[in-house]
């Protein structure tokens, strides 16, 4: 979608001692898009900037911010490039502030995220359909990638694996022939129009054993608690505590990993605090958030549930309609 920003600075890449120019134009431009591109490029040619630094300096001067005022920047390493134009004492680290702004989505963004969820659901459903005795995780993973491509989207990542190799997202070797009773765990992510789709599910081939059922019953308690509590006003830290407590009280006392994160242009849109720790934040209407519950029991396997929720005035709307239960095939 076109940007809603009132003014945008374009710049060229510098190369070979000059400017790397890309566009030439036909005499007659047939579409509005062509005419918009021509207008932007020709405006840039009147006063060309080489590189983002020149463009940023020009913008600061036009706004009078080289003389006074505070400037928020989402990467304070860029301050060094503005030396002589903007003194460090007038720079504010606006990383979290800009993340927080992005967390409340526009109608266009919500529409794209709905599309991303639908495409991701189609892809994970296709992958689930390939699960059979003797199949490997690589085959299942490949089915996901093929369906993502057929949806016109792009694979971002597809964790986790099957059986004892379904715990631990970073395993270098996930080759494993699936057996009856094994869980197959998905953490499946794609990009659509630069926005993320992200969903997790746990599938079992055949009937789950007693341990898996016990664990999933505990997960269900946590999932239900999260759905019930997710609404404007709740702090994500409180939501996490309630979810973890519900899982622990219902059969999985060692459970640790549940959290909520924003999703959009980035996989995880969450304010950060010192040391790279994920920060808590109050939930607001029109945020798009993922609720995420994961178990990594090395030597046994994993259990996963995650999906995307649009925060409404009084609660939350699911963007996926995949079944919420342990999926048996």
Residue spans of the language-model regions?
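Active-site neighborhoods and metal-handling regions in enzymes and metal-associated proteins
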Residues: 1-329
């Amino acid at each position: 979608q076109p940007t809603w920003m009132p003014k945008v600075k374009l710049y060229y890449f510098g190369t070979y001692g000059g400017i790397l120019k890309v566009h030439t134009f036909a005499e007659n431009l047939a579409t509005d898009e062509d005419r918009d591109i021509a207008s932007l490029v020709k405006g840039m040619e009147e006063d060309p900037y080489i590189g983002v630094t020149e463009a940023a300096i020009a913008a600061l001067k036009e706004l009078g911010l080289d003389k006074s005022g505070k400037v928020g920047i989402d990467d304070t390493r860029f301050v060094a490039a503005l030396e002589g134009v903007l003194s460090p004492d007038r720079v504010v680290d606006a990383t979290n502030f800009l993340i927080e702004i992005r967390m409340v989505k526009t109608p266009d963004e919500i529409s794209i995220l709905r599309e991303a969820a639908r495409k991701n659901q189609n892809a994970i459903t296709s992958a689930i359909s390939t699960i059979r005795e003797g199949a490997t995780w690589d085959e299942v993973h490949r089915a996901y990638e093929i369906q993502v491509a057929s949806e016109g989207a792009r694979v971002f990542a597809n964790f986790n694996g099957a059986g004892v190799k379904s715990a631990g997202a970073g395993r270098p070797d996930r080759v494993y022939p699936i057996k009856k009773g094994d869980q197959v765990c998905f953490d499946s992510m794609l990009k659509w129009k630069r926005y993320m789709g992200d969903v997790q599910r746990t599938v079992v081939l055949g009937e789950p054993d007693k341990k898996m059922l016990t664990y999933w019953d505990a997960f269900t308690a946590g999932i239900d608690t999260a759905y019930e509590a997710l609404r404007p006003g709740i702090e994500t830290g409180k939501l996490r505590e309630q979810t973890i407590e519900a899982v622990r009280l219902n059969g999985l006392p060692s459970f640790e990993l549940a959290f909520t994160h924003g999703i959009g242009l980035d996989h995880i849109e969450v304010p950060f605090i010192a040391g790279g720790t994920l920060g808590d934040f109050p939930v607001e209407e029109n945020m798009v958030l993922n609720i995420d519950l994961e178990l990594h029991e090395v030597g046994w396997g994993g259990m996963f549930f995650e999906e995307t929720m649009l925060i409404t005035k009084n609660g939350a709307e699911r963007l996926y309609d995949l079944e919420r239960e342990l999926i048996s095939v």
